[in-house]
Structure formats: C-alpha cells, structure tokens
C-alpha cells in the first residue's frame, strides 16, 4: 500500500527516467527549424564536426540533442519519415545501456538509427544484432541510404561470407548481422593462425533487436565450433534397431524404480532412464545382435561408449519428435528452434544425439564431432563495452536482464493509445474440441471480412490446424520453418480482408502486418509501375484498410499457451499496432503440454466438478489465473536454469578469456624466443626435481631414470652418470646448470641449420598448435567434470565451489602440460633444412583448412547429459571409484560402470 502511494506521489522509476529524457526531446524539437535551414552538404558535414569534437575530448552524451536532430532531419530528406518523440525517447534509452520495450509497429528499426549513428561517431564500430539473416539484410539495406547520406559506412555480416568480405563488413562504421554469426566469428578469430585471418575488431557497442529472444530464449544455447571425431555411424544404426523393443514405463515409482516398462521419461528435465527390467532386456538384445559378448555387462568399463549410444538412441526415440523438434529435408535432419519455430540449418545437437536421430529417421549418419571452441550468448554479449537492446516484450523479464546483464528495462510509451481487445482464455477438455472451436471462430471472423492470424507452438500443430481448415474449405497460408523463404511475403499480406495465416511461434517476427495487406509488396511485384498504377494500388489498399478496421482489425488466435507469458504477449502484439483496432484470444485444452505437465490435476478436477459437456469451454478468471501461475512456475524454473548455467559457465569464461588473450598476444608477436627460454628453464627444473629432489643427498638421486627421461622426452642423450663418476666436485646446482646448458646448445645447433627467422616462425607455430590441442581436450574434460559435479551435494559439499576448485586445478595442470609439450616438441623435432620447416608449416596450414571445411557450428542441447567425451579421446584412462562415471549417467563410477570391478 505504502509503495503504491509513494509511486503515485513520486512516479515509478520508469516515469522518472522518461521525465528526464523528455526534457532532452524538447531540446531536439527546438533544434528542428535550425536543421531544416541547413543544405544537404551542411547536414552531411555535421558528422565530421561531431567526430572532431569527440577527438578534442568532448563527451559522447553531450552530442545527443544535436546528433539526434541531425538524424531526424536526414531521415525526413532521405525516407520522408520523421522520428516521433517516442522514437527519440527510445533512442536515448538504447544509448544508456538499457533495454527499450517498444510495442510492435512503433518503428524499432528507425529508432535504432539514432543510437547507431551516435555511437558510430567514435569510430570503434557498432554491431546491430538481429535474429535472422533476412532481417539483417533487410534492415541494412533499408537504413544504408540514411547512413551513407550522413557519411557513414554500412556492412552486412552473413554466414558463409569469405574472410575478406567479413573483414570489410566489420571495418564499417555500422555492421548488421545475426547473433549466431557474431558469436561464431569471435570463436573463429580465436582459432586463427595469423593476425591477418582475424575479422572482428574490439567489441564496442552492440544494439540487439528482439533482445528477449537472443539474450533469454537462446541464453542456454552455447555456440560450438567442432571438428570431426572418430566414425561410429555403424554403431548408431545397430543400436537403433534395438530401441523399438523397449516399452515406456508410464509412471516412475521413485521408491523401487520398478514397473512394467523398460525405461522412464522425465519430460521436465528431458532425460531418459533405464529400469532394471530394461537393463536386462537391453543386454539380451545387444548380445543377440552381436554388439556385446555373452556374459558381459553394459556396465563393464569396456562398454562405456556403448552405454552412451543406448542413452542417445533412447532419447532420440522418446523425447524428440519429427516436425516438432526437427524436420527431415533432403535426407538431412534439421533442428527446429523451440523458441522461434525456425529451422536451424547447419546446427547439430551434440553428445551423439543428432546421430541417433539420423539413425532413427534412416538418413545418412554424419560423423560425431569434438568441441574445438564454445561460448554462450550470455558471455559473448557481456564482452561488449556497451550493450543495449529493444523488443516489444521485456518487462516480464526485467529482473533477469538486470541481474545477468546489468541492463535496466525502460517501457517506452506508444505513439497512439492501444485499443486491442484481449479476450479471456477458453479451456476445453480435449485437443479435438479445441481445434473444432478454433475452426468455428475463424469461419465467423472471416465471414465478416476480418483477417485472422493463428499462432501455434510447433510445425506439427500448424499442419494439424492447416489440415482441419482445408477440410472445412477455408483458404489459408501456412508460415512455418519449412517455408522460410516466403516468410516475409506471407506476413506482409496477413492483414488482407478475410486472410487466414497460420504461423509457428514467432515466425515472421520483425515484419509488420499492415491492415488491408501491403501495397508496397504489390508495387514491388510490378515491372516499372507507372504513377497511375501506384495511385490505383494505394486507393484500393485504402478501401481494404478501412474495411478491415470496420470488421475489428486483425484477430489473433493462440492455439496453446507457451511456457513463457512473454511469447504469448509477442503473439498478441502482432495485432493493434500504431493504435489500430484488433483482438486476441487463446484456446487451450487439458491435453496441452503446459497444462499436462504443470497444471493438469487441479484444473481438470475443477472442470469435472463443473460438469463439463463435450464441446463446452470454461471461461473463468480462476482458470486464467491457474494458467498464469503455471507459466510463472516454468519461467522461474527456466530463469534458475539459465542463472545456474551462467554461474558454471563463468568459470569456463574466465579461463577462456585468459587463453584467448594469451593466444592473441602470441599471434601479434613475431619472436617468442624469450618466452621459450623462460619456459625451458621451468620445464627442466621441474623434470630434474622429479629425479634429483632439491637439497637432497646423492643417494636419493635417480640418475638412470633422469637420463632415460631426458632421452625420451627431450632427445637429450647425456652421460650424467659418467660426469658424476669423473668429476666428484660436480654437485646438484652445477649439474642442473650443465644439463640446461647442454639442452640450449643442442637447440642452438638446430637453429643454425634452419636459420633464426625460420626457427622463430616454427616456435610460434608449435606453441599455437599445442595450445589449441590442449585447450580442446580441456574443454572436453570440463564438460565431463560438469556432468557429475552435482553429486558432490550428497557429500555436503557445494557443487559450485567444487567445480571452481577442480576446474582451476585442471586449468593449472593444462598450463603446465603446455610448457612441457612445447619444449618436448621443439627438442625432439629433427630439422635439417629450411625447406623442411616450410613443409611442416604447409602441413599445418592444410590441416587447419581441412578442419575449417569440416567444422560444424552446432547447437548444444542444453539439457543433455554429455557422454564420455574425454574417455573417447584418452581411451583407457583410469577412472577413480568416486569420480563421476564417464558414461554421463550422473552416478559415481563405483555405482555405475565400476560396479563389476
């Protein structure tokens, strides 16, 4: 009560921010007459003037009123469009490292030109981030005339572009691209073998469009660059044949874990577990298929990878559904993004899951991959000096933006008041009744000429509704991941009178639905249209536009509630833009995923008590409230998962930054001989210490062992025992010095053969290659550690602290290995002629190119229990009895594959 009273008196934080900014808007408006008087040349000259002022030390914020006034005037001259006051407010919000919540149709693309221009004046580059290539290209081309009029360059960063074109795009003042491409370029730059191969500049200012989609929905999606591992496609096919013999256990009995079924499915965590009965059957079937020998157990250490195949195949069959989670197109399994409903060409699930799905669908199985580099969007975008974003729906996630990205959310008012009617939800008992009610509603709406947009949560559901509409004889367009190319065209005409459009999730997001259809699209379809033709098209459109408004504007039908209220709001937000009329309603059934998992028992009990008849719907505030609570539960659970993921990833992130900065330093210098010399001293000291403990008696020395180690690891054949026999005065210190001096002498002789310059080049190559190879193994080991770390909780230890401690010691061990391997490689390599060094370099380049061609940019299935990635690389590595089992089950080794040992 008191808080409400204080808010009324002083205004909310949002009100106070807007009040402060409105004063600046008044200053900008006052400058308008002055700007109108300037010639085009004088207006263009303002950019150079602003840059000169910045160089003299003026603060960027002081330029806001004048810079925004210049952009507004330029936009009037180039586009004939004047920024509204609310767009100026949005521009200021975006410049202040905030999220601007601007409703659909309020002109976010035009708003973005203001902060993009202002921050481009620094010359450090501005990255405008969009959700797909089409929007990146569209926005760049639309805004290019404005920026070029003001003397700024514009670049577009698209997947598959050659490195020189990418470098040029990043060198531009303002670069447009997708979140995936920026992230992958960052990773690729940190795998480059020479400074010239890098494409990005230092990350300065990112302006993220649809910021909720990128920073929240995709936050759990690490970007992974992976190279090919060993081929095991045959095994996937063989294991796949066995899975149909298993029966799913309907209810998991947590006490005994017994039941009639062979495996249980946890839909919330997307995991599959074998029951005891299932384990026995699987072992029998594996023996029958000749995959496993009789008498062997699936839990024997030799079968760790087999267990991984079985788990992957089970998950592929039980949890992943065709046309919901993926589609099969041209003999390929293509992932469908669960948040946007779009296909993700080129992305692959990790941990063998993608191969298991390929085996299930009977398409060609592609090789498994090994992670070479990875980063989450959360950590990538936090690398920017300055970050801001805009979306139509951010307020529900304001707390997350603030706690993870330190970004405040400011709700920017609409230019015209909102008059859309959001009707209460209708809840049916079954899916079939719900679909029937939707068809009836569509018939009713289209009969009076009202356009309808139907939002579904998956391709499968969109095709189900489409089939029913076809049966009912209603013409309609389907917009889902399968028809990506026509997306914008279909959306542009979704406002046509009586048009019916079915869209998955947010397909077509970023394209406005204009009531009456898009007259621009009609004009674009004509070849060289005359002025009369254009006028006629506009006049026809005006008639249609008025007719649609009279019929009630665009009507939105939601066929199911999403896990997040925000995505529901996005669907609703497609209607009622710029103060237009519109309406929306969600249709639900007790068979919907959200209701089944989170709200079923209470609500269905309530509905039965009310004596529901088939085809009848319940429309009550209690039900709507129960659904909102279910969504809140899911949202908070997802937030906790993302927060947990970030806390764990922060550990890896610190290590990643350390490795990448060291790698970049290495790339930028041409001579690493000083580093090599200091590393050599450390390595030889540690090696000698292992055989001659410091300040020890001669009886404690292991001279034969030391001689053998120096010979095997450093190619140093030294008669140490002979020296000690012949020279009694040789003590520990002088012996150490002599061994080091001998190693330097041998190395210098090699250098004389190939020449100093060639040797420096070779040293740098060896360091880079060793660093990359060890970092790759370290990533797999970290992944592996992460899978079982939660079990430390049972030992009353904080898993997070344990993870930090262990990963730090692994990192320290990796750095020690790096030193050792570099010196060992350089000592053992036999080089005789400069040509041989050049040949080695050439081999390295060819290997890098081969890897680059085979690299996969993959989509990490975030809930997956990773398989024994490290075990696969290191073969028969000894696993401690209390370590997490390498099969990825999450159990201790002694309770899993170590049970029989």
UniProtKB/Swiss-Prot annotation:
Start and end residues of each stretch annotated as Disordered: 868-901
UniProt KW Phosphoprotein keyword: no
Induction note: Repressed under conditions of excess protein secretion capacity and derepressed when protein secretion becomes limiting. This is regulated by SecM.
Cystine residue pairs: none
Gene Ontology CC: one annotated term: plasma membrane
Pfam families from the UniProt entry: P-loop_SecA, SEC-C, SecA_DEAD, SecA_PP_bind, SecA_SW
GO BP of this protein: intracellular protein transmembrane transport; protein import; protein targeting; protein transport by the Sec complex
SMART domains for this protein: SecA_DEAD (SM00957), SecA_PP_bind (SM00958)
Reaction(s) catalysed (UniProt annotation): ATP + H2O + cellular proteinSide 1 = ADP + phosphate + cellular proteinSide 2
Basic residues biased stretches: 891-901
Recorded superkingdom: Bacteria
Cofactor(s) demanded: Zn(2+)
Binding site for ATP: 87, 105-109, 512
InterPro entries, sorted: Helicase_ATP-bd, Helicase_C-like, P-loop_NTPase, SEC_C_motif, SecA, SecA_CS, SecA_DEAD, SecA_motor_DEAD
Principal location listed in the UniProt entry: membrane
EC id: 7.4.2.8
Signal peptide boundaries: none
Family: Belongs to the SecA family.
Assembly and binders: Monomer and homodimer. Part of the essential Sec protein translocation apparatus which comprises SecA, SecYEG and auxiliary proteins SecDF-YajC and YidC.
Protein name: Protein translocase subunit SecA
Organism: Escherichia coli O1:K1 / APEC
Lineage, broadest ranks: Bacteria, Pseudomonadati, Pseudomonadota, Gammaproteobacteria, Enterobacterales
């Amino acid at each position: 009560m008191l808080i409400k009273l204080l808010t009324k008196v002083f205004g909310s934080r949002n009100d106070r921010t807007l009040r402060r900014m409105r004063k600046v808007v008044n200053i900008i408006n006052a400058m308008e007459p002055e700007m109108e008087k300037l010639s085009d040349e004088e207006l263009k000259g303002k950019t150079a003037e602003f840059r000169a002022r910045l160089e003299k030390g003026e603060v960027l914020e002081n330029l806001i009123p004048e810079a925004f006034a210049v952009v507004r005037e330029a936009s009037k001259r180039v586009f004939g469009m004047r920024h509204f006051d609310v767009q100026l407010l949005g521009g200021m919000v975006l410049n202040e490292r905030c999220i601007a919540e601007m409703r659909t149709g309020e002109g976010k693309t035009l708003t973005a030109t203001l902060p993009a221009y202002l921050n481009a004046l620094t010359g450090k580059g501005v990255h405008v981030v969009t959700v797909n290539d089409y929007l990146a290209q569209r926005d760049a081309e639309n805004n290019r005339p404005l920026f070029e009029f003001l003397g700024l360059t514009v670049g577009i960063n698209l997947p598959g572009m050659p490195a020189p074109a990418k470098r040029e795009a990043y060198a531009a003042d303002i670069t447009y691209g997708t979140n995936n491409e920026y992230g992958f370029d960052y990773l690729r730059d940190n795998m480059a073998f020479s400074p010239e191969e890098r494409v990005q500049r230092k990350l300065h200012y990112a302006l993220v469009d649809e910021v909720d989609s990128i920073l929240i929905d995709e936050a759990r999606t690490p970007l992974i660059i992976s190279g090919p591992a060993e081929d095991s496609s045959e095994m996937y096919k063989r294991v796949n044949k066995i899975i149909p013999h298993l029966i799913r256990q309907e209810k998991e009995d947590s006490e005994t874990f017994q039941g009639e079924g062979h495996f249980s499915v946890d839909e919330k965590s997307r995991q599959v577990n074998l029951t005891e009965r299932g384990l026995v059957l699987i072992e029998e079937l594996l023996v029958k298929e000749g995959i496993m020998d009789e008498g062997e157990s699936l839990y024997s250490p030799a079968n760790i990878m087999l267990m991984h195949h079985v788990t992957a195949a089970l998950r592929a069959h039980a949890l992943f559904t065709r046309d919901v989670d993926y589609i099969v197109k041209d003999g390929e399994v293509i992932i469908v993004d669960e948040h946007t409903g779009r296909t993700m060409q080129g992305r692959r699930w990790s941990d063998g899951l993608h191969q298991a799905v390929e085996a299930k669908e009977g398409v060609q199985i592609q090789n498994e991959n090994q992670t070479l580099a990875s980063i989450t969007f959360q950590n990538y975008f936090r690398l920017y000096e300055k970050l801001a974003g805009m979306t139509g729906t951010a307020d529900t996630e304001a707390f997350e933006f603030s706690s993870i990205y330190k970004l405040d959310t400011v709700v920017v008012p609409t230019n015209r008041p909102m008059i859309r009617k959001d009707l209460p939800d209708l809840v049916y008992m079954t899916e079939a009744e719900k679909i029937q009610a939707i068809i009836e509603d569509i018939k009713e709406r289209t009969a009076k000429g009202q356009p309808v947009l139907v939002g579904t949560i998956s391709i499968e559901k969109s095709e189900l509704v489409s089939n029913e509409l076809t049966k009912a004889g209603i013409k309609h367009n389907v917009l889902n991941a399968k028809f990506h190319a026509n997306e914008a065209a279909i959306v542009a005409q979704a406002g046509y009178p009586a048009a019916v459009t079915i869209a998955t999730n947010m397909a077509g997001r970023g394209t406005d639905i204009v009531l009456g259809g898009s007259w621009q699209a009609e004009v674009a379809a004509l070849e060289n249209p005359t002025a009369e033709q254009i006028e006629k098209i506009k006049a026809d459109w005006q008639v249609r536009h008025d007719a649609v408004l009279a019929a009630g504007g665009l009507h939105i039908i939601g066929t199911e509630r999403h896990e997040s209220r925000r995505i529901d709001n996005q669907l609703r937000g497609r209607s009622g833009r710029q103060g237009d009329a519109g309406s929306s309603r969600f249709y639900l059934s007790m068979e919907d995923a959200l209701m089944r998992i989170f709200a079923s028992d209470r609500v269905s009990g309530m509905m039965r008590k009310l004596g529901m008849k088939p085809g009848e719907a319940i429309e009550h505030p209690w039900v709507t409230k129960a659904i909102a609570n279910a969504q809140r539960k899911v949202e908070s659970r997802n937030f906790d998962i993302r927060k947990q993921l970030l806390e764990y990833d922060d550990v890896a992130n610190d290590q990643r930054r350390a490795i990448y900065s060291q790698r970049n330093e290495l790339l930028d210098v041409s001579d690493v001989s000083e580093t090599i010399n200091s590393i050599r001293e450390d390595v030889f000291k540690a090696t000698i210490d292992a055989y001659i403990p410091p300040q020890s008696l001669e009886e404690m020395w292991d001279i034969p062992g030391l001689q053998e180690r120096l010979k095997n690891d450093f190619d140093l054949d030294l008669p140490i025992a002979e020296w000690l026999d012949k020279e009694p005065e040789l003590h520990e210190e002088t012996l150490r010095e002599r061994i080091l001096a001998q190693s330097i002498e041998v190395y210098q002789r090699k250098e004389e053969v190939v020449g100093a310059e060639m040797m420096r080049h070779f040293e740098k190559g060896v360091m880079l290659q060793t660093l990359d190879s060890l970092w790759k193994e370290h990533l797999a080991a970290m992944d592996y550690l992460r899978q079982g770390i939660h079990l430390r909780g049972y030992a009353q230890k904080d898993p997070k602290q344990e993870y930090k401690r262990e990963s730090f010691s692994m990192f320290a061990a990796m750095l020690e290995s790096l030193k050792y391997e570099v010196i060992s490689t350089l000592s053992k390599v036999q080089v005789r002629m400069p040509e041989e060094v050049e040949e080695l370099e050439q081999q390295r380049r060819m290997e890098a190119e081969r890897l680059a061609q085979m690299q996969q940019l993959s989509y990490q299935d975030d809930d997956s229990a990773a398989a024994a990635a490290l075990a696969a690389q290191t073969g028969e590595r000894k696993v401690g009895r209390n370590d997490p089992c390498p099969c990825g089950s999450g159990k201790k080794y002694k309770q899993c594959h170590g049970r029989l040992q």
